[in-house]
């Protein structure tokens, strides 16, 4: 697998704060947060461990955004669901689990579960009960409750075209216009961050700083062969 970590963008989000909101059974120590730090070495990436109970997690996130005032919030899966509700900030929701209760019931997330990443509190396992699933169902009822025209311009949704777990693209699009599919699954890997997250972060950073970048538009026909297939030059430009 190609590694994209040697590539970094020191000026991207320089001096700014990014809040990363992890997914279910993950933690702030997730590799995704480390990748964001390596791509943007002069930005501060905050990645707190979230409490298991959604009301507690949402309270922690609201306290965090009030005290830290992040310039950008990025959330994945369950974290994408929470991120949508952190109104007043620029946000990127990746494979957001807006139907978290149903997702937990349908994808073997009941009973004893092990955290995928180390937590600061040392907890390694939890028991997912019907009561906890009900808490998540109730939390997701608050999604999209404060969508305005201004919020619609501040939120981006990214959805893996091969995601076997979360399918909320159409639901997101009912409330926010800036939604795209990317080639990938549910878990956010380095390649997806490099090709899809970083360009959106750059656009947000430019908008925040009032920067206008020169653009060169290349028509698809110039990069396709006689059979309509991509030339090697297209692959090189993409990579």
Give short role names for the model-derived ranges.
Residues 4-14:
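Short beta-strand-to-loop junctions in surface cap/lid or active-site-entrance loops
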Residues 12-67, 186:
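Active-site catalytic motif of lipid deacylating hydrolases and related acyltransferases
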Residues 213-239:
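Alpha/beta-hydrolase-fold serine-hydrolase catalytic core, especially in secreted/extracellular enzymes
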Residues 20-24, 74, 158-160:
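Short hydrophobic segments within beta-strands
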Residues 84-90:
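Glycosyltransferases and closely related glycan-assembly transferases
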Residues 74-84:
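Gly/Ala-rich beta-loop-alpha elbow adjacent to hydrolase catalytic centers
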Residues 90-220:
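The alpha/beta-hydrolase serine catalytic core
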């Amino acid at each position: 697998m190609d590694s994209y970590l040697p590539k970094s963008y020191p000026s991207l989000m320089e001096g700014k704060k990014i809040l990363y909101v992890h997914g279910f059974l993950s933690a702030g120590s997730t590799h995704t947060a480390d990748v964001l730090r390596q791509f943007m070495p002069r930005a501060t990436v905050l990645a707190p461990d979230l409490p298991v109970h959604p009301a507690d997690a949402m309270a922690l996130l609201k306290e965090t955004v009030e005290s830290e005032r992040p310039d950008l919030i990025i959330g994945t899966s369950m974290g994408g669901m929470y991120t949508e509700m952190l109104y007043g900030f620029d946000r990127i929701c990746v494979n957001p689990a807006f139907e978290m209760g149903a997702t937990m019931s349908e994808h073997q997330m009941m009973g004893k579960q092990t955290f995928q990443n180390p937590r600061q509190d040392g907890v390694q396992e939890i028991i997912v009960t019907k009561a906890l699933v009900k808490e998540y169902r109730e939390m997701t009822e608050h999604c999209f409750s404060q969508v305005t025209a201004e919020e619609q311009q501040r939120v981006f949704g990214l959805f893996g075209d091969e995601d076997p777990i979360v399918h909320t693209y159409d639901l997101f699009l009912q409330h926010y216009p800036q939604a795209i599919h990317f080639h990938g699954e549910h878990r956010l890997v380095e390649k997806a961050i490099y090709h899809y997250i970083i360009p959106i972060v750059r656009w947000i950073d430019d908008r925040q700083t009032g920067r206008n970048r020169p653009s060169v538009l290349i028509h698809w026909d110039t990069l396709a062969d006689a059979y309509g297939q991509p030339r090697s030059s297209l692959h090189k430009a993409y990579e």
